[in-house]
From Swiss-Prot:
Entry's localization field: Cell membrane
Encoding gene per record: atpB
Protein name: ATP synthase subunit a
NCBIfam families cross-referenced by the UniProt entry: ATP_synt_6_or_A, PRK05815.1-4
Gene Ontology annotations of biological process type: proton motive force-driven plasma membrane ATP synthesis
Function: Key component of the proton channel; it plays a direct role in the translocation of protons across the membrane.
Stretches that traverse the bilayer: 18-38, 79-99, 112-132, 174-194, 205-227
Assembly and interaction partners: F-type ATPases have 2 components, CF(1) - the catalytic core - and CF(0) - the membrane proton channel. CF(1) has five subunits: alpha(3), beta(3), gamma(1), delta(1), epsilon(1). CF(0) has three main subunits: a(1), b(2) and c(9-12). The alpha and beta chains form an alternating ring which encloses part of the gamma chain. CF(1) is attached to CF(0) by a central stalk formed by the gamma and epsilon chains, while a peripheral stalk is formed by the delta and b chains.
Source species of the chain: Lysinibacillus sphaericus (strain C3-41)
CDD domains assigned to the protein according to its UniProt record, in alphabetical order: ATP-synt_Fo_a_6 (cd00310)
Family recorded in the similarity comment: Belongs to the ATPase A chain family.
Amino acid sequence: MNHEAPLLEVGFLTFNKSTVMMLLVAAIIVFLIAFISTRSLKLKPTGMQNFMEWIMDFVKNIIKSNMDWKTGGRFHILGITLIMFIAVSNLLGLPFSIVYGHELWWKSPTADPTVTMTLATMILVLSHFYGVKMKGTGHYAGTFFKPMSFMFPLKLVEEFANTLTLGLRLYGNIYAGEILLGLLAGLASSGAVGFIGAIVPMMAWQGFSIFIGFIQAFIFTMLTMVYMAHKVSDDH
């Protein structure tokens, strides 16, 4: 499990080539799913179109559980993109991993904290952007001092804590799952006895990790809509 990350330095920036590649793979898979599902639309959906419409309704219900649809409808595409992209990203590293020259190339991109924290920061920025856009700068800034002005430092801590927990929750669950799968794979390759002892736990953990991957995508999307509602709804 002591694999190195393939790094690329561009000026003062350092990129993990594996993470960049896997993000592109996840984006391509999501694009293909969306393209195949919508290329021949029918009044009575079947197959992939039925699957895509189910996702759309599922995300719509998430939004409506947090804010009225008139306000939250603008976040529908964001929610669909998030839940599909994160679910695919969570599952990419489960079937196998690819190591070349002691460098790990194939993994779940969400097992990298820079990815999950970037997603969380993106949600933070978007929530503030829409808060200012829909409420106005003065009104929105005033919400940080309600109900009392001394709440302002606590509101700042809350913003930081929400972003941190949103990103690290996703990272921790996916990274821990891949670590345990790697340990079980190492046990299975140690010999016949190790293989027999590891095969059942590995299959069970694979199934559980798939479940966790979908659940974490749902949780991230749900919390995104909770944070958005908190910023843009008048009753928050």
